[in-house]
């Protein structure tokens, strides 16, 4: 797919009314995504339950935050053409003309080098290597290749967003055992139903931008099926830390109850097309517009309602899982000793 950094006629017709501010450069770093990355990395660092000097711990988290910001800046530089075509992203600094593409790219490269080198010299090179791999995988493999060429883009590309707990654990201990990778697996399996729920009700947005998200390529019915399948795989994996010497009773309760809600919402999404004779593609049915109109009335309906509910709860569920692990580590709560599957710490 050819790539162009030229703004749309609509954007070009509206000149920038101000120079870039520091907030615009900060937005390049995707602060909301960065906050989730930092949170899961911090959980990994503390869940290792290995003493680490507070200053070194802070430096490690800072490096991970900078690395996440670097990935975001590189993504916004390369995806400026796509972002300009989508309602959800056209207000970003580069397509708006507030920050030049080359400035975003330069910021991303500089922050990437800074975060990896600082992590290696101040913490350890295993954590630095994992951080470097994460940045390259997200900025190059996902952004420049997978996102534009395959409907499995967020499945494979989700590895980049799943790695921060392992980076945090490696920063604290100098190694990354199976329990660290179990946290990675949780995020990896959580990513597809999370993003596919979003893509269900903005599928036309993706279609107009030429992004081959699953609903665009395979349709809504197949997407709902995949959401349910990944949800069925996710729930037992989320329960696993309680049986591997990683989580305690608090985590078991949160993962169990939250998992039931998550699975219930996924089933509702799956059943929302039951009995339909056809599987309308985005060109025939704009779920984004349907959902927006319904939301304004205060009564989201049908596809938009169920997809929105799952998308919103998926964020809460992931946060609750890692918050439970974090709370148990900080408070020194005992882990369960069920001896079902003992993984090395």
Curated annotation (Swiss-Prot):
Transmembrane portions of the chain: 33-53, 54-74, 105-125, 126-146, 154-174, 182-202, 226-246, 247-267, 315-335
Membrane topology: Multi-pass membrane protein
Residue runs in coiled coils: none
Keywords for the protein's UniProt record, in alphabetical order: Cell inner membrane, Cell membrane, Heme biosynthesis, Membrane, Transferase, Transmembrane, Transmembrane helix
Pathway: Porphyrin-containing compound metabolism; heme O biosynthesis; heme O from protoheme: step 1/1
GO biological process entries: heme O biosynthetic process
InterPro entries the record matches: Protohaem_IX_farnesylTrfase, UbiA_prenyltransferase, UbiA_prenylTrfase_CS, UbiA_sf
Localisation: Cell inner membrane
GO molecular function per UniProt: protoheme IX farnesyltransferase activity
EC number assigned by the record: 2.5.1.141
Catalytic reaction equation(s): heme b + (2E,6E)-farnesyl diphosphate + H2O = Fe(II)-heme o + diphosphate
Enzyme kind, highest EC tier: transferase
Chief localisation class: membrane
UniProt xrefs under CDD domains: PT_UbiA_Cox10
Pfam families: UbiA (PF01040)
GO cellular component: plasma membrane
Note, other: Carbon 2 of the heme B porphyrin ring is defined according to the Fischer nomenclature.
Entry-linked NCBIfam families: cyoE_ctaB (TIGR01473), PRK04375.1-2 (NF003349)
Cited PANTHER family: 4-HYDROXYBENZOATE SOLANESYLTRANSFERASE, PROTOHEME IX FARNESYLTRANSFERASE, MITOCHONDRIAL
Family: Belongs to the UbiA prenyltransferase family. Protoheme IX farnesyltransferase subfamily.
Function, in words: Converts heme B (protoheme IX) to heme O by substitution of the vinyl group on carbon 2 of heme B porphyrin ring with a hydroxyethyl farnesyl side group.
Name of this protein: Protoheme IX farnesyltransferase
